[in-house]
Amino acid sequence: MLIFAALLQNLLFTPSRNGKIRLLVDHFRTVPDPERGLALAAITRDLDIPSVKPALLRELVSNRVDEELFRLSYDYVGDLAETVALIWPVPGGEREDRNDAPTLSEVVDALLAASRREGPALVEGWLDRLDASGRYALIKLVTGGFRIGVSARLAKQALADFGQVPVEEIEELWHGLEPPYESLFAWLEGEADKPVSAALAPFRPVMLSHPVEDGDFSRLDAADFAGEWKWDGIRVQASVDNGVKRLYS
């Protein structure tokens, strides 16, 4: 969790798109499976942890902190995850020499196997074992509330840069893959063949619009092209494959 927490913090405080991509590429290069794939799934919001909801965090912190103090702190900080991470009182106080922080895979595996009744005790125990940045990352992970300026598209571009492949190849595979994406990383590192997507009706990357200038008509044969107006608004792709129908936007 500490490595994942450092990644989130660096992404949050890195304003440039290229800087964020470099951080992600470095993470993919230096962090082993399954940690890097789980971090990717969390950032792209493809990791669903059903046993923990924001209301649970309020209940947990209410057992540790005066209600009025928490209300005032939340009003001042403005973010639930950050407030809980900062105000959470660790029994015996914070210790810099602690070495029992859970790994990202430990947290994910335990929560996916836990019932709604078991989830709170797990989260409470981890909050006690982590520092403030680790608690923040844990809370964001379990609630899915990442706001770090990284879109799924940017994460896929980082994968493409990491493996030196076109981003369109990542997008075509994406909906047929599942976390922690070990076959994807093996291919990108040149250690395995390209994964075969088992998903029916997959997404196909949309070609960007290309304007036609007046001088182009004299050298282009209109019969070779299909053209349409470029409408403003969101794009939607309808895909049909062996009876499976999907809409992508």
Q: Whereabouts are the PLM-identified features?
A:
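N-terminal nucleic-acid-engaging modules of covalent nucleotidyltransferase systems
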Residues: 1-249
